[in-house]
Every structure is written in C-alpha cells, then in structure tokens.
C-alpha cells in the first residue's frame, strides 16, 4: 500500500474553511484514503506548524488548539508518528502552560530515552516530569 503525507495547508483548509472548495477536497481526500488503498501520514512538523499557525495567525486559545490537536490525533485516516508524544504534549501545553514545541521536544526526548535536556529555556522544560534540565 503506498504511503503519502499530508501538508499543513491541507489540514488548515479543513479547520479554517477559508476556501470552501479546497476544504471539501481535503475532507474528500481523508474520506477516500482507505478506498484508494492509500495510507496518509501527518508528519510531526506539520502538527507543530498547525499549532503555530492557529496560535499566531488565528489567535486560537490553548483550549481550542487542544481540541484541534486531539481531533487530528483521533482522525483514523491519518497516521502520526509517536502519537503518544503528541497526546502528552497537548495535555501539558494546556495544563502546565508551556509552549507546544517545548512539550513535544521534551516528550519526544523522554520517549526515546533521553532524560537530560540542555537548554536556556528552563522554565518550560522543568514542567515536564522526568526531564532533567541543565544549562550548557
């Protein structure tokens, strides 16, 4: 079965609906993936970019961003590498008020066995349980 990845712009058209034709085509792509024997992937960087755009360009609240990310993670037609990392990261992003990218990096590191992070941005990383933050 061929694999393909979906760009951030496709996800944003579905969410923002600023171009109805593109939004419908994007939804149809997701719905028809199984029938086409096609596996669709959303790359981790696309999840990060989606969150950034929703926060910076559309002023989504943290709670609204959380709802969007959870909806993406629960979309059966999309496969996301290390999905559990994103589930923990979005929860921490809201509950502990840290940057989403920092939460993803922290949990990605922990997922891969890294327990120490060297950073000048200690504030956010210190809020991730199990991660030892150090300055270079």
Language model regions located:
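Residues that scaffold the ATP/ADP-binding catalytic core of kinase and kinase-like folds
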Residues: 13-15, 53, 128
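Acidic, PIN/NYN-like endoribonuclease modules and their adjacent C-terminal/linker elements
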Residues: 1-3, 106-136
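Active-site neighborhoods of divalent-metal-dependent phosphate/nucleic-acid chemistry enzymes
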Residues: 77-120
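Histidine- and aromatic-rich ligand-binding microenvironments
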Residues: 6-7, 42-43, 98-99, 121-122, ...
């Amino acid at each position: 079965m061929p694999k393909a990845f979906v760009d951030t712009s496709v996800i944003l058209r579905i969410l923002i609906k600023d171009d109805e034709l593109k939004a419908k085509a994007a939804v149809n792509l997701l719905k028809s993936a199984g029938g086409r024997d096609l596996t669709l992937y959303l790359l981790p960087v696309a999840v990060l970019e989606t969150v950034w755009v929703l926060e910076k360009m559309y002023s989504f609240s943290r709670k609204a961003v959380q709802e969007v990310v959870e909806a993406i993670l629960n979309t059966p037609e999309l496969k996301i590498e290390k999905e559990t990392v994103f589930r923990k990261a979005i929860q921490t992003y809201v509950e502990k008020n840290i940057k989403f990218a920092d939460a993803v990096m922290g949990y990605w590191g922990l997922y891969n066995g890294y327990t120490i992070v060297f950073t000048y941005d200690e504030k956010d990383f210190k809020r991730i349980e199990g991660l030892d933050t150090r300055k270079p």
